[in-house]
């Protein structure tokens, strides 16, 4: 397992390829309760760029604006319990579309969360089929939804290796955490925060730093299901 800096849930990645497939789609306003306004007021470009590594490669998403706008919840069944989160499709359409693509292609099945932090920051990092912290899906895409981003307990956000290097790795925040707004938030846990806190209470092997390592209670994904809301 690669050594990671303790202050941020980053992942190590190799260089990216330069070919880009981009799609421009309407970005919708949301009300205070998260309901999308019908009138598009801006556009957002979803660019999924072929990249290495390509672990458990499932292809590269072809952005579908209609599908991306559909609200959904993701239910992640793990060996430690079930976690459900509501995807922020209006605020992070490129990220939520990518996550849905990977989930619907069984990308996460039988993978496990490889990093738990219990000091300074409080996250459980998942989404790498190699379980090393250096794996990726074979493509990357830019950051979004960072303006004013905060990371309270229950946040689901992307891990990265620097600006605009998102892939498949993501993290759950199991306790309110202060991070710079550099990690795309794309969901909120609606059930299973207790599962995350149980895993956190089990501690880690601290192989990276004290309170930062491989979780002792390893959550392996049995499956990840997408449900329309």
Feature roles, as predicted:
Residues 2-229:
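Cyclophilin-like peptidyl-prolyl cis-trans isomerases
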């Amino acid at each position: 397992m690669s050594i990671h800096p303790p202050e941020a849930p980053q992942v190590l990645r190799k260089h990216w390829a330069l070919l880009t497939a981009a799609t421009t789609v309407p970005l919708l306003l949301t009300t205070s309760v998260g309901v999308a306004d019908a009138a598009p007021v801006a556009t957002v470009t979803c660019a999924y760029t072929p990249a290495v590594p390509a672990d458990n490669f499932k292809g590269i998403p072809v952005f579908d604006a209609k599908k991306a706008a559909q609200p959904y919840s993701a239910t992640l069944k793990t060996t430690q319990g079930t976690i459900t989160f509501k995807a922020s499709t209006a605020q992070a359409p490129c990220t939520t579309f990518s996550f849905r693509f990977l989930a619907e292609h069984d990308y996460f099945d039988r993978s496990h969360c490889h990093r738990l932090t219990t000091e300074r920051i409080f996250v459980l990092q998942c989404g790498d089929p190699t379980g090393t912290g250096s794996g990726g899906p074979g493509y990357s895409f830019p950051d979004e939804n960072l303006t004013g981003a905060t990371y309270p307990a229950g946040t689901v956000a992307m891990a990265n290796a620097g600006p605009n290097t998102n892939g498949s790795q993501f993290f759950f925040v199991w306790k309110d955490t202060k991070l710079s707004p550099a990690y795309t938030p794309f969901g909120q846990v609606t059930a299973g925060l207790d599962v995350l806190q149980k895993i956190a209470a089990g501690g880690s092997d601290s192989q990276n730093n004290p309170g930062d390592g491989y979780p002792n209670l390893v959550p392996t994904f049995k499956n990840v299901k997408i449900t329309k809301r």
